[in-house]
């Protein structure tokens, strides 16, 4: 879990900005969104193969 301590003489907006940055760097929200709903193993496999195909195409046309 991301933790941010508010520094002395730091505005709440600055602390919130630092907290959001740490959460995005840790990947907490992405992990939550990925696990929010159950995905059948067949769907996971299909999405994984599609992502691999996209990566392969991007590398080929670069």
Curated annotation (Swiss-Prot):
Region (Disordered) residue spans: 43-62
Sequence ranges of Basic and acidic residues compositional bias: 43-52
Record flagged with keyword Ribonucleoprotein: yes
Record's GO cellular component terms: ribonucleoprotein complex; ribosome
GO biological process: translation
Sorted UniProt keywords: Ribonucleoprotein, Ribosomal protein
Pfam families: Ribosomal_S21
A Gene Ontology molecular function term of the record: structural constituent of ribosome
Ranges of Basic residues composition bias in the record: 53-62
NCBIfam families: S21p
Family: Belongs to the bacterial ribosomal protein bS21 family.
Record-given protein name: Small ribosomal subunit protein bS21
Gene label: rpsU
């Amino acid at each position: 879990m991301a933790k941010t301590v508010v520094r002395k003489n730091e505005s709440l907006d600055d602390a919130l900005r630092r907290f959001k940055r740490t959460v995005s760097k840790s990947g907490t929200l992405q992990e939550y969104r990925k696990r929010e709903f159950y995905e059948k193993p067949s769907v996971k496999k299909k999405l994984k193969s599609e992502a691999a195909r996209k990566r392969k195409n991007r590398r080929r046309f670069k």
